[in-house]
Amino acid sequence: MSKSKAKGTAAERDTVRYLQFYWPLAERRALSGNKDRGDIAGIPRTAGEVKAAVKIELAKWQQETLTEMQNAGADHCFLVIKVPYKNVSKWDFWMPAYQLGLEDLRFKDLKEARWVRMDFELGRDVLKGVIAALWAAP
Protein backbone atom coordinates (compact mmCIF):
# COMPACT_ATOMS: atom_id res chain seq x y z
CA MET A 1 0.00 0.00 0.00
CA SER A 2 1.34 3.45 -0.90
CA LYS A 3 2.12 5.98 1.82
CA SER A 4 -0.70 8.33 0.71
CA LYS A 5 -3.20 5.45 0.53
CA ALA A 6 -2.21 4.37 4.05
CA LYS A 7 -2.75 7.95 5.32
CA GLY A 8 -6.20 8.03 3.73
CA THR A 9 -7.15 4.66 5.18
CA ALA A 10 -6.00 5.74 8.65
CA ALA A 11 -8.01 8.98 8.40
CA GLU A 12 -11.12 7.02 7.36
CA ARG A 13 -10.62 4.62 10.26
CA ASP A 14 -10.23 7.49 12.75
CA THR A 15 -13.30 9.22 11.30
CA VAL A 16 -15.41 6.08 11.67
CA ARG A 17 -14.31 5.60 15.28
CA TYR A 18 -15.29 9.18 16.05
CA LEU A 19 -18.69 8.83 14.36
CA GLN A 20 -19.46 5.57 16.17
CA PHE A 21 -20.23 7.56 19.33
CA TYR A 22 -23.65 8.31 17.77
CA TRP A 23 -23.78 5.73 14.99
CA PRO A 24 -22.36 2.39 16.19
CA LEU A 25 -22.92 0.90 12.73
CA ALA A 26 -20.73 3.48 10.97
CA GLU A 27 -18.01 1.82 8.92
CA ARG A 28 -15.62 2.37 6.06
CA ARG A 29 -17.37 1.68 2.79
CA ALA A 30 -15.76 -0.81 0.44
CA LEU A 31 -14.81 0.54 -2.99
CA SER A 32 -17.73 0.16 -5.37
CA GLY A 33 -16.64 0.85 -8.93
CA ASN A 34 -17.27 4.03 -10.90
CA LYS A 35 -20.37 5.11 -8.92
CA ASP A 36 -18.60 5.99 -5.68
CA ARG A 37 -21.04 6.39 -2.77
CA GLY A 38 -18.58 7.90 -0.29
CA ASP A 39 -16.07 6.61 2.22
CA ILE A 40 -18.43 6.17 5.19
CA ALA A 41 -21.49 3.92 5.47
CA GLY A 42 -23.86 3.18 8.35
CA ILE A 43 -25.24 6.67 8.97
CA PRO A 44 -28.91 6.91 7.92
CA ARG A 45 -29.49 8.59 4.55
CA THR A 46 -26.03 10.19 4.66
CA ALA A 47 -22.89 9.95 2.52
CA GLY A 48 -19.54 10.87 4.06
CA GLU A 49 -16.22 11.63 2.41
CA VAL A 50 -12.83 11.75 4.16
CA LYS A 51 -9.66 13.42 2.88
CA ALA A 52 -6.12 13.38 4.28
CA ALA A 53 -3.98 15.17 1.73
CA VAL A 54 -1.18 17.70 1.85
CA LYS A 55 -2.68 19.72 -1.01
CA ILE A 56 -6.20 20.92 -0.19
CA GLU A 57 -8.57 20.78 -3.18
CA LEU A 58 -11.70 21.94 -1.40
CA ALA A 59 -13.98 22.78 -4.35
CA LYS A 60 -13.13 19.49 -6.07
CA TRP A 61 -13.73 17.48 -2.89
CA GLN A 62 -17.03 19.24 -2.20
CA GLN A 63 -18.25 18.36 -5.69
CA GLU A 64 -17.11 14.75 -5.23
CA THR A 65 -19.04 14.61 -1.97
CA LEU A 66 -22.24 15.92 -3.60
CA THR A 67 -21.89 13.42 -6.45
CA GLU A 68 -21.38 10.58 -3.97
CA MET A 69 -24.48 11.69 -2.06
CA GLN A 70 -26.48 11.41 -5.28
CA ASN A 71 -24.90 8.04 -6.14
CA ALA A 72 -25.82 6.75 -2.67
CA GLY A 73 -29.40 8.05 -2.90
CA ALA A 74 -28.75 9.94 0.34
CA ASP A 75 -30.39 13.11 1.66
CA HIS A 76 -27.30 14.46 3.41
CA CYS A 77 -23.55 14.50 3.00
CA PHE A 78 -20.47 15.71 4.79
CA LEU A 79 -16.77 16.11 4.09
CA VAL A 80 -14.11 15.56 6.75
CA ILE A 81 -10.60 16.89 6.13
CA LYS A 82 -7.79 15.75 8.39
CA VAL A 83 -5.89 18.64 9.98
CA PRO A 84 -2.28 17.61 10.67
CA TYR A 85 -1.18 17.51 14.31
CA LYS A 86 -4.73 17.97 15.63
CA ASN A 87 -7.02 15.58 17.45
CA VAL A 88 -9.75 14.09 15.24
CA SER A 89 -12.36 16.20 17.08
CA LYS A 90 -10.66 19.32 15.66
CA TRP A 91 -10.48 18.19 12.03
CA ASP A 92 -12.48 20.24 9.51
CA PHE A 93 -16.08 19.15 8.97
CA TRP A 94 -17.99 20.59 6.00
CA MET A 95 -21.70 20.38 5.13
CA PRO A 96 -23.72 22.13 2.41
CA ALA A 97 -25.51 25.14 3.95
CA TYR A 98 -28.90 24.13 2.52
CA GLN A 99 -28.80 20.90 4.55
CA LEU A 100 -28.62 23.02 7.68
CA GLY A 101 -31.56 25.18 6.64
CA LEU A 102 -29.26 28.18 6.19
CA GLU A 103 -30.29 28.89 2.62
CA ASP A 104 -33.08 27.98 0.28
CA LEU A 105 -32.57 25.66 -2.63
CA ARG A 106 -32.50 28.70 -4.90
CA PHE A 107 -29.70 27.32 -7.00
CA LYS A 108 -30.58 25.12 -9.95
CA ASP A 109 -27.64 22.81 -9.58
CA LEU A 110 -25.98 21.30 -6.52
CA LYS A 111 -22.67 22.59 -7.90
CA GLU A 112 -23.78 26.04 -6.74
CA ALA A 113 -24.28 24.96 -3.13
CA ARG A 114 -22.41 26.91 -0.47
CA TRP A 115 -20.72 25.00 2.35
CA VAL A 116 -20.32 25.58 6.08
CA ARG A 117 -17.15 24.62 7.95
CA MET A 118 -16.97 23.66 11.61
CA ASP A 119 -14.76 21.42 13.71
CA PHE A 120 -15.59 17.72 13.67
CA GLU A 121 -16.86 17.74 17.25
CA LEU A 122 -19.54 20.32 16.44
CA GLY A 123 -20.15 18.80 13.02
CA ARG A 124 -20.91 15.39 14.47
CA ASP A 125 -23.44 16.95 16.85
CA VAL A 126 -25.02 19.06 14.09
CA LEU A 127 -25.28 16.03 11.81
CA LYS A 128 -27.05 14.12 14.57
CA GLY A 129 -29.59 16.94 14.87
CA VAL A 130 -30.10 17.20 11.10
CA ILE A 131 -30.74 13.47 10.81
CA ALA A 132 -33.09 13.49 13.83
CA ALA A 133 -35.07 16.34 12.24
CA LEU A 134 -35.29 14.41 8.98
CA TRP A 135 -36.78 11.40 10.74
CA ALA A 136 -39.18 13.57 12.76
CA ALA A 137 -40.53 15.36 9.66
CA PRO A 138 -44.01 14.25 8.54
Label each PLM-derived region with a short phrase:
Residues M1-P138:
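Catalytic phosphate/metal-binding cores of nucleic-acid and nucleotide-processing enzymes, i.e., regions
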